[in-house]
Every structure is written in structure tokens, then in C-alpha cells.
């Protein structure tokens, strides 16, 4: 069982909110995207990515009702419904191939993000208004006791369990490729925003998928760089552990980022896996 709550804020500097997210508890799915600041129609790219991922999962992974609506500094409504689909791979269902090292859910996420990439690129090529738009994306899906995470760009997913918080994703950035796992050095580097891989910029993007088994009670944090760019891991973990509920956790993360002077849009989704 998945419970989740999300908050997004335009912030005090950007004229529009180019972050977007969706939660579907029935599908055990959370998706967060960050349209790149300075690019044309970044908010359109972020929305397209989230919708494409959620729509593909709903169509191929489960039956589902409407997913949600536009949000601004508030949580997306939590919608229920859906049934597990355990059918084997079918011809034509995996246009980007089937990775046998991944679970069915992992392959669904991988395919969904590739489809989002194609849709955004085709829209950008066909319109001067949307030329150059692109986005990051991080999507988490739980199937049984397995967590599958698909991601591109620098939107992150953290897992808080026991006495540890771990970053499960790795940023697609020039700084991360040079500095590795030194998160503080990355945060302070003047080129920290230079991304090496995004959704919608080229015909084939690199989609990363990581999976692990859950035991129950784990807290998942999906955040854009407007949040993790100003809050170090210690602060993120403290806020996550101090929150009494998911709404408070997500709200505290965004509020703290804004209080620390974040100049970007800020989005945080807090989700908890509850073993049946």
C-alpha cells in the first residue's frame, strides 16, 4: 500500500512554475518533473512528461480512473482504483525493448519515460513556441514489495528507512560526473545546473532504472533541485523525520527550501510504503 502527498511552489523569483507532479495511490505511482528554467515552455514539457508516464502506466499496468489536476502550492488529490496486471510481455508493447534485468514495473517506467521523450521532442520540433523545451523526471512505482525508480536529469528520490537516508538516484549533471557522490561540493559548484541528460532534447535519452525490495514503513522523498539544491542531506533527513505525517513532511521541505532562499520552483512528494 502506498500513501503519498505532494506540494509545489512557484517560489519568489521565477515568473511561472515549471515543476509538475502527479500521485496515483491506486497505481502505487508518484511522478515529479522539472521543466528546465530558461528553456521555452519548460512547464509544458514537465506536464507532458508526467502525463505521459502516468498515462502509460495506467494503460499498460493497471485500470485507473482520472489521475489528478493542476496543483499550485497544494497537494494533488489522492485517487484510488486499479488492479495489478501480471501479464507477460507482449509483442509491440515494448517499443524500446524489454530489459530482462528489470522487473515488469521497471520496464513499464523505462518505456513510459522513453515515450515521454519522443512526445516532447516531436512537439518541440513542430512548434517554434515550444522549440528547445525539455525536462527532468523521476518516477517511483511499487509493485508488491519491489520499488522501481525511473529517472532522467537531476530530480531526486531519497529513501528514509531505519537510521539511514539514501539517495537512490544519481544526477545527470556535469558536476556529478566529475565530483561523484560529494553532494555538498555539487551543491556549491557554479556549474551545478548544467545537465548532461534530459527528457525531450534528443531522439533517444538515457533512462536510468534502479530497483530494490522494501520491507515496510520506508519513506520516499521525490524532490526537484529547487529543494535539494539548497537543503543538504542532513537537513532533508531531519525534516523528513520530524514530520508527523506526509503532508507536514512535504510542506516542510518546500517551506524550508524557500526560507533558505531557493531561487527555483520547489516541489516535494513524500510517500510511505505500508506492507500489507
Question: What are the roles of these predicted feature ranges?
Answer:
Residues 1-276:
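PP2C/PPM-type serine/threonine phosphatase catalytic domain
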Amino acid at each position: 500500500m502506498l500513501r503519498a502527498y505532494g506540494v509545489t511552489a512557484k517560489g519568489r523569483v521565477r515568473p511561472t512554475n515549471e515543476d509538475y507532479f502527479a500521485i496515483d495511490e491506486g497505481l502505487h505511482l508518484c511522478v515529479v518533473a522539472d521543466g528546465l528554467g530558461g528553456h521555452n515552455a519548460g512547464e509544458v514539457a514537465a506536464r507532458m512528461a508526467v502525463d505521459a508516464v502516468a498515462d502509460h502506466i495506467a494503460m499498460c499496468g493497471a485500470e485507473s480512473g482520472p489521475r489528478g489536476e493542476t496543483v499550485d502550492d497544494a497537494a494533488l488529490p489522492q485517487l484510488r482504483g486499479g488492479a495489478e496486471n501480471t501479464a507477460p510481455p507482449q509483442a509491440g508493447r515494448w517499443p524500446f525493448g524489454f530489459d530482462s534485468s528489470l522487473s515488469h514495473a521497471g520496464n513499464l517506467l523505462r518505456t513510459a519515460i522513453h515515450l515521454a521523450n519522443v512526445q516532447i521532442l516531436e512537439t518541440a520540433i513542430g512548434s517554434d513556441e515550444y522549440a528547445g523545451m525539455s525536462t527532468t523526471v523521476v518516477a517511483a512505482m511499487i509493485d508488491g514489495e519491489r520499488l522501481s525508480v525511473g529517472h532522467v536529469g537531476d530530480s531526486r528520490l531519497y529513501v528514509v528507512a531505519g537510521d539511514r537516508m539514501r539517495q537512490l538516484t544519481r544526477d545527470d549533471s556535469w558536476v556529478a560526473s566529475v565530483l561523484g557522490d560529494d553532494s555538498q561540493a555539487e551543491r556549491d559548484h557554479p556549474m551545478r545546473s548544467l545537465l548532461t541528460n534530459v527528457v525531450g532534447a534528443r531522439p533517444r535519452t538515457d533512462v536510468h532504472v534502479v530497483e530494490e525490495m522494501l520491507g515496510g514503513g520506508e519513506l520516499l522523498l521525490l524532490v526537484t533541485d529547487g529543494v535539494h539544491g539548497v537543503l543538504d542531506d542532513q537537513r532533508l533527513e531531519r525534516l523528513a523525520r520530524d514530520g508527523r505525517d506526509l503532508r507536514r513532511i512535504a510542506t516542510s521541505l518546500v517551506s524550508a527550501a524557500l526560507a533558505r532562499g531557493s531561487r527555483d520552483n520547489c516541489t516535494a512528494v513524500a510517500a510511505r510504503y505500508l506492507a500489507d
